[in-house]
């Protein structure tokens, strides 16, 4: 995600970072990059008002669960915003690899089929 943030900054774009996660000692200090950071509540209509006021041109979701939670709200509130799912890390593939590793076996294609795969692919297609 930081590579994307740096790319947009280098192109002169204004970047806003929005998260529903609590602050952590492990998070990047985005204020050094002059990025506005905001906290939003999950399952709360206040996000709709927030994103309408922000009125972004592009919204990047860092994982499919974030797209599931907020994508439809962005679509409703900012229908012209381009919505992008960052797929540098496919969670269904990571989970399948982890299970195969725990069993000490190779990963087989059939093991990729899961509810997680369907959810993540649905987020990509949206």
Regions found by a protein language model. Give the residues of each.
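N-terminal subdomain of nucleotide-sugar transferases
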Residues: 1-28, 32
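A short acidic, amphipathic alpha-helical/loop segment
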Residues: 3, 29, 49-50, 69-74
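Structural motif
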Residues: 18-22, 41-42, 61-65
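Conserved nucleotide-sugar phosphate-binding/catalytic loop shared by glycosyltransferases and other
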Residues: 25-46
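Short N-terminal targeting/anchoring amphipathic segment
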Residues: 50-69
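Short, conserved loop/helix-junction motifs that constitute active-site signature segments
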Residues: 54, 74-79, 124-125
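Active-site proximal beta-strand in glycosyltransferases
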Residues: 78-95, 103
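Membrane-proximal helix-turn-helix segments that form the acceptor-binding/catalytic region
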Residues: 108-126
């Amino acid at each position: 995600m930081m590579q994307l943030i740096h790319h947009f900054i280098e192109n002169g774009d204004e970047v806003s970072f929005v998260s529903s996660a609590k602050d952590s000692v492990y998070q990047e200090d985005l204020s050094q990059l002059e990025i506005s950071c905001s906290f939003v509540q999950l399952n709360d209509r206040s996000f709709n008002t927030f994103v309408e006021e922000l009125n972004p041109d592009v919204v990047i979701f860092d994982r499919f669960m974030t797209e599931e939670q907020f994508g439809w709200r962005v679509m409703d509130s900012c229908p012209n915003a381009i919505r992008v799912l960052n797929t540098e890390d496919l969670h269904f593939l990571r989970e399948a690899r982890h299970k195969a590793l725990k069993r000490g076996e190779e990963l087989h294609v059939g093991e990729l089929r899961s509810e997680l795969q369907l959810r993540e692919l649905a987020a990509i297609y949206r």
